[in-house]
A protein has these predicted regions:
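Bacterial N-terminal signal peptides
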Residues: 10-22
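Proline/serine/threonine-rich low-complexity linkers at boundaries of modular beta-sandwich domains
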Residues: 21-30
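Electrostatic cytochrome c docking/interface patches
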Residues: 40, 124-144
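Beta-strand-rich structural segments
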Residues: 44-58, 92
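Short amphipathic beta-strand segments in non-cytosolic proteins
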Residues: 53-54, 65-80, 157
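Gly/Gly-Pro-rich "capping" loops immediately C-terminal to redox-active cysteine motifs
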Residues: 61-63, 140, 149-184
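Residue-level recognition of secondary-structure-to-loop junctions
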Residues: 84, 94-98
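Axial heme c-ligation environment in periplasmic c-type cytochrome domains
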Residues: 161-170, 184-223
Length: 223
């Protein structure tokens, strides 16, 4: 065996290790919220617990996410994010001090993966709660807050995203029972989609949105 062959055999595994490490260190991440409120009460903390997954799959501990909420008039509120009980999970209590419409953005702490969440209506203390969203509208909001936007495109949520046609859900319809089973357990078919442990009502809402079983009401469009 020549010296060149020895060097090649010694260095190639090291090179492979470096390439794998570099690939793991880079890329993008998705943020998945456990629960995202339909509205909030001014001055009352909102608990936000979320997971960060590299490339939508690998849970990432040891990050330093940040949460920032803003209004169109320039008000700002921030929350202290701390690790939660589960691997790659984080939690924060965010207080929105004034009624109005607030936009919450979570910076995952992994590269530049930031997630602007759907607008939250903040009501005054003692004010009546807004009417609940219809399932399709709630599903639209979950499409973003559960991290579906990390891989998929839908013209009503993230029209700017460029992706493979198979990941573009705009205008697509699936058998309702199959779609619900897949959302509950993605392993029923070969796919890289993680199991997000969706609740039954979340599955119903996402299925309603993806299949467009109903249209938004005028009040919901205004909200």
């Amino acid at each position: 065996m020549t010296t060149n062959h020895v060097i090649r055999l010694v260095t190639t595994p090291a090179l492979v290790f470096i390439l794998i490490s570099a690939a793991f260190a880079g890329g993008w991440a998705i943020v998945t919220l456990d629960d995202f409120p339909e509205y909030a009460v001014a001055g009352k903390p909102v608990n936000l617990t979320f997971a960060v997954r590299q490339h939508g799959v690998t849970l990432l501990p040891g990050l330093h996410p940040t949460i920032r909420a803003t209004t169109a008039t320039g008000l700002t509120s921030k929350a202290n994010v701390v690790p939660a009980a589960g691997r790659g999970e984080y939690t924060a209590a965010l207080t929105l001090p004034q009624q109005g419409e607030w936009t919450i953005t979570i910076a995952s702490g992994f590269n530049d993966s930031n997630v602007p969440l759907p607008a939250v209506k903040v009501i005054a203390p003692g004010a009546p709660a807004p009417a609940p969203f219809s399932p399709p509208t709630r599903g639209l909001r979950l499409f973003r807050s559960k991290g579906c936007i990390g891989c998929h495109r839908h013209i009503e949520v993230n029209p700017e995203r460029v992706t493979d046609a198979k990941l573009d859900l705009t205008g697509k319809r699936f058998p309702q029972d199959y779609l619900k089973r897949f959302l509950a357990d993605p392993s029923i078919k070969p796919a890289e989609m993680p199991n997000l442990k969706l609740k039954n009502d979340e599955i119903e809402a996402l299925a309603a949105f993806i299949n467009k079983l109903a249209s938004k009401t005028r009040e919901e469009v205004q909200r």
